[in-house]
Design a protein with these regions (language model features):
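Helix C-cap/helix->beta junction micro-motif
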Residues: 76, 173-174
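Long alpha-helical, hydrophobic tracts
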Residues: 63, 104, 146, 154-155
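Conserved small/polar residues in nucleotide/adenosyl-binding loops
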Residues: 179-183
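Feature activates predominantly on carbohydrate-active enzymes
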Residues: 1-109, 116, 122-140
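Active-site cleft segment of glycoside hydrolase catalytic domains centered on the general acid/base Glu
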Residues: 147-166
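Short acidic/histidine-rich active-site segments
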Residues: 84, 142-149
Length: 183
């Protein structure tokens, strides 16, 4: 709940910790859900008008709540870095729109070879980054970009192009993009 995040920021401020990365989406491991992606728990925790029905029903933040949270954290000198984790850990997105899921690597991975994947993720990021008063208030945004397959050269190159695309998209809104370098 938001009250937990607010308490966490207060504790961080007390100990002079100044950065909190908030994962807005993630999912469980399918082996704990009968090896079935359809049963595997996944959630996206931020209100979305672009994709009605995407937002988790068992706990989420309204846009206003999240904006207020970021601004309040800033008064305590704590920067909130929102993360929309793509192209892996994306089961919440593929539960919502199954056709963008990877059949080869698992439904918690976006299919990097489908144009609809880019359209979906572009629109999602734009919803939170565009305008004079964007939902993501700070300058830094995290996009995940880790734990995707490196087994095939064509997939690695597509992953590189995918990452480059989102670097340009996020930075095009004047934000600094953060991502986790794949190992």
């Amino acid at each position: 709940p938001m009250s937990y995040l607010q308490d966490l920021v207060n504790i961080m401020a007390y100990y002079k910790m100044n950065t909190l990365q908030v994962h807005l989406n993630d999912n469980g491991f399918k082996q704990y859900f009968d090896n079935n992606w359809d049963k595997t728990y996944a959630a996206f925790r931020l209100e979305s008008e672009t994709y009605p029905g995407l937002t988790a029903r068992d706990g989420s933040y309204s846009k206003k709540e999240f904006i207020d949270f970021q601004k309040q954290a800033a008064t305590n000198f704590v920067e909130i870095i929102p993360e929309i984790d793509i192209p892996a850990h994306s089961l919440a997105f593929t539960h919502y729109k199954p056709e963008i899921g990877s059949k080869e690597y698992g439904m918690d991975h976006l299919d990097l070879f489908k144009p609809e994947t880019y359209q979906f993720a572009d629109n999602l990021f734009k919803e939170y980054l565009k305008g004079d008063d964007p939902v993501f208030v700070g300058k830094r945004v995290h996009i995940g970009t880790y734990e995707y397959s490196n087994a095939k050269k064509e997939v690695v190159e597509k992953f590189r192009a995918f990452t480059d695309h989102y670097i340009r998209l996020v930075e095009g809104f004047g934000n600094c993009l953060l991502y986790t370098s794949p190992s």
